[in-house]
A protein has these predicted regions:
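N-terminal secretory signal peptides and thylakoid transit peptides that target proteins
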Residues: 1-18
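C-terminal motif of bacterial Sec signal peptides marking the signal peptidase cleavage site
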Residues: 24-25
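Conserved flavin/dinucleotide-binding core of flavoenzymes
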Residues: 34-82, 136, 204-206, 413, ...
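Glycine-rich active-site loop/strand segments that organize a redox cofactor
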Residues: 47-56, 130-161, 312-333
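N-terminal glycine-rich phosphate/pyrophosphate-binding loop and immediately adjacent elements
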Residues: 73, 81-263
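Conserved beta-strand->loop/alpha-helix structural units within folded catalytic cores of enzymes
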Residues: 92-107, 122-125, 397, 425-432, ...
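Active-site/ligand-binding neighborhood in enzyme catalytic cores
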Residues: 244-395
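Mid-domain catalytic core of redox enzymes
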Residues: 385, 389, 393-523
Length: 640
């Protein structure tokens, strides 16, 4: 039944001062310092509501209103301004995109060419960081943080030398990672504590049925797996099949030879295996898809059996010899999941550290990793004429080309004004799919390569609660919710790093972090890329009111039996809409195997004169360290 949303609820969830935010720009007249009150670390007065400070904005964030319309007019209809105001601004380097690749490219260039190098970074959003967005909430003098996108730092051992040096330069090295691990509570499953209690929640007759313990371990035949499965509101026959799958009671591929098994797991979808070989009903599949759909952004219909197993899906014990052969791959995948660390605002702190290195005046008092989470950022300092590096927000690039003066002209639109700037070099750190529209002079094969991949959409929501009383009674910090709009529900990262003081008990206000992937539903004949396009449309076309309704209903059903009342306990809602999320990773069921150097992302990322490309799309992998590698490559191309 729909939940009635009062006017107060709407105001709590609406974007506070959105009009002022979009119109205020980054002018000198806006003061953005957040005064720190005397007392415990992490205790703040709320920011001045008239100040330009995007992290405290609630309502619809991510690809927010005003960030995508100009680009869509260009990409969908070929429309852009005919005339531009030529600004008297020339730079050594212009970077299009202030996400991780863009910020890293600017930093690599600054380090190589000197602090006096003139750099301009343009971004269409009202905040920097790309997917690494910071969501900030205030209540009763306390600040609460959560992540609005990119979450974690993978093990530095997997970083290239260039990426490791970049991280070390902002204070993140092996010693700091170890410190972060020590500061991460053992019960915080979201931040890589895989031994922590984590559960599953399914709708029942009287609200959600929650099963605690360690559900992830249960899926691999761990402690109390049978008891956990028997507690699920499922027919006994389905429970029996799940128990067989988790425990490895039988080899579901025993009618195949070894060669046939290997062929099968590389050519058949994971979900088809569950239906045809394990005998599960399609209605049970969401239980087994809930983990991978948020880790990989696609469902078991899109992954082969092998890809599913090595992405963390259940069933490796139930494939006999071939399961043992793939166990090492699965172990490596799970080790990757375990080897993660997280700031309280996700990778937004990494973005803040990079921005402060590029433009020290944005946070002159910040010491580094020890206070990055609580440092006061002055957004009016981002785009100042007297700074060598400038970061210009709310600015959508619509054209990039070399002129006859051995320069790159960059056209962009900022708050309705069409403007042009020039540079000696340009790095495009935006989405691959936009680049052919920015640079129509590119070779056709390069434009085709850039257009091949389709980014994976997500929705990340953060919900500020008056206190943590009801949530604390669930018995775990994270629950998979396979039959709900948001498939993961967790506490926000309560990590005491960067100076942040997280909630200390159930009486403190808290933030609930919720993840949604739209890649659900039955098997489809369409390619995965077409399915991703349809899912992206779903994300774009769903209004905030609908997301708010879904959030309130889901939390009320999950927490209601513990005294939760959405009407009084929810203080604010931030929905981070991410239609263009993870970089497209090639999938065996849909994509051919290309010769080295001939894959679409490799053809697409070729240097184009004074223009280079740096993003995770160009690496076909959605990892921050590869965003840095792409940035390093682009800068090396332009400074060779």
């Amino acid at each position: 039944m729909p939940i009635d949303i009062t006017r107060r609820d709407f105001i709590n969830g609406a974007v506070i001062g959105a009009g002022g935010l979009l119109l205020s720009g980054c002018g000198n007249e806006v003061a953005t310092e957040i005064p720190v009150t005397a007392g415990a670390p992490g205790v703040f007065n709320p920011p001045d509501p008239s100040a330009y400070y995007p992290p405290t904005q609630t309502g619809m964030r991510g690809s927010h209103e005003g960030s995508f319309e100009v680009a869509h007019e260009l990409a969908w209809r070929g429309k852009k301004p005919k005339h531009y105001e030529a600004l008297e601004e020339h730079y050594d380097l212009i970077v299009v995109g202030a996400g991780m690749s863009g910020l890293a490219a600017a930093r690599y260039y600054q380090q190589k060419m000197g602090a006096d190098a003139r750099i301009l970074i343009l971004d269409n959003h009202d905040d920097f960081g790309g997917h690494a967005k910071r969501n900030e909430f205030h209540q009763d003098g306390r600040m609460m943080l959560s992540l609005g996108g990119a979450q974690n730092i993978e093990a530095l051992s997997g970083y290239s030398d260039a990426a490791r040096e970049l991280m070390a330069g902002i204070g993140i090295d092996d010693n700091f990672i170890e410190f972060m691990n020590q500061q991460t509570p053992d019960e915080l499953f979201l931040a890589g504590k895989m031994e922590a209690e984590n559960g599953i929640a399914m709708p029942g007759a009287n609200g959600h049925v929650t099963v605690g313990g360690n559900w992830l371990a249960a899926m691999f035949g761990g402690k109390d797996y049978e008891k956990s499965v028997r507690a699920l509101p499922l027919p006994t026959t389905e429970q029996d099949k799940l128990i067989d799958l988790f425990a490895g009671h039988q080899d579901f591929l025993d009618d195949f030879s070894l060669t046939e098994k290997w062929e099968y797991i590389n050519t058949t979808s994971y979900n088809r295996y569950l239906v045809d070989k394990v005998g599960l009903a399609e209605s049970t599949l969401p239980i087994l898809n809930a983990i991978v759909i948020n880790l990989a952004g696609v469902s078991g219909w899109n992954l082969t059996v092998l890809e599913g197993i090595t992405s963390g899906c259940a069933g490796i014990k139930s494939m006999g010899w071939v399961g043992k052969a793939t166990a090492k791959l699965a172990e490596l995948a799970l080790d990757s999941l375990l080897s993660v660390t997280m700031f309280p605002d996700g990778n937004a702190s990494v973005a803040r550290l990079l921005v402060q290195k590029l433009i020290p005046a944005v946070a002159p008092g910040m010491q580094g990793t020890q206070d990055v989470a609580i440092a006061r950022f002055d957004y009016s300092a981002l785009d100042q004429e007297n700074h060598a590096t400038r970061l210009r927000l709310n600015s959508t690039a619509v054209g990039v080309r070399e002129n006859n003066n051995n320069q790159v002209e960059v056209d962009y639109v900022q708050q309705g004004k069409a403007q042009r700037v020039t540079a000696d070099h340009c790095v495009l750190a935006c989405y691959n799919a936009l680049i052919p529209h920015l640079c129509p002079e590119m070779p056709e094969d390069q434009k085709e390569g850039l257009s091949y991949g389709v980014k994976t959409p997500f929705v990340y929501a953060n919900v500020q609660l008056k206190d943590g009383q009801a949530y604390s009674k669930l018995g775990a910090t994270l629950f998979q919710c396979p039959y709900d709009p948001f498939q993961w529900v967790s506490t926000s990262p309560a990590v005491a790093v960067g100076g942040y003081e997280p909630p200390r008990g159930p009486d403190d206000p808290m933030v609930v972090f919720m993840m949604r992937s739209p890649m659900t539903g039955p098997e489809q004949p369409a390619s995965c890329r077409d399915q991703l396009r349809m899912a992206r449309h779903t994300v774009y076309s769903t209004p905030f009111d609908d997301y708010e309704q879904q959030i309130r209903q889901q939390l009320q059903s999950l927490l209601g039996k513990h005294g939760f009342n959405h009407e009084t306990d929810i203080q604010a809602i931030t929905v981070n809409r991410i239609p263009h999320g993870y970089a497209y990773a090639y999938l065996s069921l849909y994509d051919p195997k290309w010769e080295e150097g001939q894959a679409p992302h490799e053809i697409g990322r070729a240097q184009f004169g004074r223009i280079s490309i740096a993003n995770t799309d160009s690496e076909a992998t959605a990892l921050m360290n590869l965003a840095f590698d792409a940035a390093w490559r682009a800068v090396e191309e332009q400074t060779a």
